[in-house]
């Protein structure tokens, strides 16, 4: 029987770096998490995962089976380097090839959701043409995802093009495809001038997972929990009252910390206390 407990996961980059997924999932289990989100970022090392052999892919599947800690989602931020909106045809083609490989990888190892970075371009100047190319690239990507039965979910970003659920919903309506949904980050959403509760309510029915982190205006990473502007209890209450029952993912970048596990445990306890106050989980 499936548990009625709210699934709580941890981002791969919060845990010690390395390529042994069995060790990573064992640690996540020890820390009390239900799942780990994989990162495929713009570095060559993590991009290389998309070219894993059959044996390497099976090793991940085996690690999930052995630990019962799932890897249901992938944070695909590689499109910073190879954006779908690039005016360079070769760069854009590489971005689409990364998408194709990511979808195939997800299909092979059981990943259900690929979180997309909402950048038309990142290191270049955006314009009408980059936005048009981005839209067309999303359409092509969602067509591929549909055939593979893999969900593509747009993150709410640290970037004006996609800094609210309302903006992401515009793309959802444009694409009009059940395999394209939303994966909001309550930290990013709160760092902009958004009515956060209204935005969360507007996204219900399209939200497949939620990133949990703290932020400040203009500071989107490495803000310790409790030192930023996010009203966590209110966000959790709004999502609960709106009927959201999906997973929450603590997003951290503590893989290079002196003691990543201790940092993660501290953040886990802090977040779960706010979840308990909002009625999402039982108090410890």
From Swiss-Prot:
PANTHER family: ISOMERASE, L-RIBULOSE-5-PHOSPHATE 3-EPIMERASE ULAE. One of its GO terms (biological process) is L-ascorbic acid catabolic process. The keyword Ligase does not apply. Pfam families: AP_endonuc_2. Signal peptide: none annotated. One of its GO terms (molecular function) is intramolecular oxidoreductase activity, interconverting aldoses and ketoses. Its EC number is 5.1.3.22. Keywords: Isomerase. Belongs to the L-ribulose-5-phosphate 3-epimerase family. Induction: Induced by L-ascorbate. Repressed by UlaR. NCBIfam families: hxl6Piso_put, PRK13209.1, PRK13210.1. Catalyzes the isomerization of L-xylulose-5-phosphate to L-ribulose-5-phosphate. Is involved in the anaerobic L-ascorbate utilization. This is L-ribulose-5-phosphate 3-epimerase UlaE. It catalyses: L-ribulose 5-phosphate = L-xylulose 5-phosphate. Pathway: Cofactor degradation; L-ascorbate degradation; D-xylulose 5-phosphate from L-ascorbate: step 3/4. Transmembrane segments: none annotated. It comes from the Bacteria.
